Amino acid sequence: MFKAELSDSSILKTSFDAISSIVDEVQIQTDSEGMRLDALDRSHITFVHLELKASLFDEYVCDVPEKINIDTGEFMSVLKRAKSQDRVIMSLDEGNFIITFEGDATRTFKIRLIDIEYDNPTPPELEHPASFKVHFGILKDAINDIDIFSDKIALQVDEDYFRASADGEFGDASVKYLHGENINTQEKSLFSLDKIREMLKADKFSEEAEIGLGTDMPLKLTLNMVTGDGKLSFLLAPRLESDE
């Protein structure tokens, strides 16, 4: 038996708003400790990991481990129907992923499970030379500022500042943020702005983002719930000069 109840749908909505932009299908794995997924987009550019602990849920039961293969777009379409005051209940029944919203009315949706062979991707083990935290709102504003002039963004960090910049045909833009971390190196990488924008759709998961950065290395973006009950993280491959 699997059953998970949440009094607030926002964590699921914000998580799968990002995830559904990156991958079409996922396998959600459940056990007594909670729900999690690992997925890699078709172009092998973005890796995503989601972990929701059993303690996050108002009620959580998973007697035996389950593998739930679903279409992320269909799941997101259902989640968009949740009202702010609705309780969300997830369960399984005869090849269906059941999502029920309980509020002024009880609404039930059945998503057919996908019969696919799913190889769970494993992320590379990376040690980024620089790791630091930034307020999510500052990061999102920086991306929106850069978006004016270019479809790619340079992220760099040194002893004092985290910088985002772009050089476009019609103009340039740059944003810098005093990070306040103990960093003794200078690192810089170039990334697709569209790919970063997909990740930043998870803007309600956490108020703070942890960034791992290294020269010509994948970007690591980690969002941790302040309660410690959930984590959403991404790895984004860099755009090398030879890609231009």
UniProtKB/Swiss-Prot annotation:
Keywords: DNA replication, DNA-binding
Subunit structure: Homotrimer. The subunits circularize to form a toroid; DNA passes through its center. Replication factor C (RFC) is required to load the toroid on the DNA.
Presence of keyword Ribonucleoprotein: no
Record field: transmembrane: none
Chain's role: Sliding clamp subunit that acts as a moving platform for DNA processing. Responsible for tethering the catalytic subunit of DNA polymerase and other proteins to DNA during high-speed replication.
InterPro entries: DNA_clamp_sf, Pr_cel_nuc_antig, Pr_cel_nuc_antig_CS, Pr_cel_nuc_antig_N
Coiled coil: none
GO molecular function list: DNA binding; DNA polymerase processivity factor activity
Family stated for the protein in its record: Belongs to the PCNA family.
The protein's name in its UniProt record: DNA polymerase sliding clamp
Domain of life from the UniProt record: Archaea
GO biological process, one term: regulation of DNA replication
Signal peptide: none
